[in-house]
């Protein structure tokens, strides 16, 4: 398994994962909304998305959004989204994604 920053060519498979993530939170399936949202994030660079992949298949993702800390007077990243496909759970994917976010 490899964890890396998402790239534009990940748009389609990442959109499917994001749609699954939203369905997990009881939102109706809506691949167009998922694709539009993820496409905007990838194109605008206003979030950092890490993906876990194995043999070319995306297994999960985590998405971080920028914020600022007044106390430390610096930028920080808020982990807002973490999702692992049902078929890839209990295999360390979530842990690897969390580690990538922490290291960022």
Please provide the spans of the model-predicted regions.
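Conserved GNAT-fold acetyl-CoA-binding loop/helix
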Residues: 15-40
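Conserved donor-binding loop and adjoining core beta-sheet/short helix segment
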Residues: 62-75, 80
């Amino acid at each position: 398994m490899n964890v890396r920053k998402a790239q534009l060519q990940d748009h389609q498979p990442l959109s499917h994962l994001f749609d699954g993530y939203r369905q997990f939170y009881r939102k109706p399936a809506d691949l167009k909304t998922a694709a539009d949202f993820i496409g905007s994030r990838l194109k605008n660079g206003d979030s950092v998305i890490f993906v876990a992949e194995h043999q070319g298949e995306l297994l999960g993702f985590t998405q971080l959004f920028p914020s600022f800390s007044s106390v430390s007077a610096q930028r920080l990243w808020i982990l807002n989204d973490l999702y692992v496909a049902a078929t890839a759970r209990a295999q360390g994917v979530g842990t690897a994604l969390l580690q990538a976010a922490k290291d960022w």
